[in-house]
């Protein structure tokens, strides 16, 4: 009679523990890449997930068996209406206390933005006075950030009016004075996704995944299901032993919340940026979303989240070597599927 092997591979990753619900629907960007392109540029943008389709394009990645040939690529459409730059914030750095805010300057938002739905205490501002106060502290500044508000009313698939706020780092150069001058120029104005990204660029996608509620260990951790025979009369979709409650290790797989987690997916390529949403809207519209009516971004592959969910796109923080050598190249798309997604 054969003996069971003494070790099995660990099921599931402890790197994502605790597996709890995300604290906020619009994720906060925790890390920013160091970008040097010779001019200031915002390093992130917010959009709303519309849905998926597929395209045919010429594979321009070097060293691939399909290089130079037409390939099938699944894509995700993210609708990205222009964002209003509501405020500029400066951060200083202290070795003992870390990063701290030096102050901020707010611009008066237009009435159609309805920013008071998000910030109920919003009042009137003396923007020039606040900017002058920031300039006096510019010698202590390490980071320049923009507080930008989305315009969900311009998105075709959304019915909400409350804008979402996102803090965006301004990068591209190391001179803080140039970064601050750029922030002053865009304060109170709109920025488009074309001002942040370009076609062919790699971005990181940060979003909250689709929620699945309370699930067992098989679905939540991927543990192996036990054989269904008489010696496993207590169940098969469970772990073999957990011990009693007081001495259970935290690494032990247990049932609980699954999904609705904040996740980051790296190096998603932008295949297209366009203002005509009908180029990518399938017949009958995207399921649970509708028609794309404003500027959109087409990303290769899948991304986290459900339709209508806020998606944060950030400059790639760890791009591959081939991308660093060849740079940004515009993809050659030969076909976009507009077939209906009903019943798929």
UniProtKB/Swiss-Prot annotation:
Coiled coil: none annotated. Keywords: Ribonucleoprotein, Ribosomal protein, RNA-binding, rRNA-binding. Disulfide bonds: none annotated. One of its GO terms (biological process) is translation. The keyword Ribosomal protein applies. HAMAP family: Ribosomal_uL3_A (MF_01325_A). Belongs to the universal ribosomal protein uL3 family. This is Large ribosomal subunit protein uL3.
